Amino acid sequence: MPADRLDGWLGRFESRHGAVRGSRQDEALTLTAADGAVARVHLPCAPSQSDRNDLVAAAAAFGSFGLVLVRRGGFAVGRVEQGSLKASRCGTRYVQGKTKAGGWSQQRFARRRANQADAVAQAAAGAVSAVLGRIATTLVCGGDRTLLRQTLELSGADGWPVVRWLDVPDPRRQVLIDAIPRARAARIDLNSAARSLGS
């Protein structure tokens, strides 16, 4: 659910199901309505309180973060400020597919594939340093988790908080732009009572 539509959705949930009581559980805010309907709202940054106004404010406030997308076919790194892409760097790299050859050929191809994947991580790490700098920032990451961990380690960003993981196709600039609203969106899980009335 886009962050700017969350307030309206919460209002409709309450009007359909009755008064709502909020409670924090893990990284989500659980909203329990009078009729037993339950909605678990997951945001990239958890609200400090458990009421509707704070939830909406927390969703709207998450607008500045680093976006790091890495897959074997390339990488895209962006700095997002107030919900807009302010700086980015993208690149593609060739990583050979798996082979069905056996013996020495298989080992040679595996080494070549590993070296090519390392080159992707090195290039992506350079982009992280260039675009995001050295000051720790909140990150949203997407793609191949092994390559992402390697990229963050190489760039010195492995200690930075990662608040969300996205599934993405091969990273390009447009994929980076399309990932911004997904990174900021609220994820809502409903129980059967909430789904039965089409919340």
Where does each model-flagged region fall?
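Terminal alpha-helical anchor/extension segments at protein ends
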Residues: M1-S199
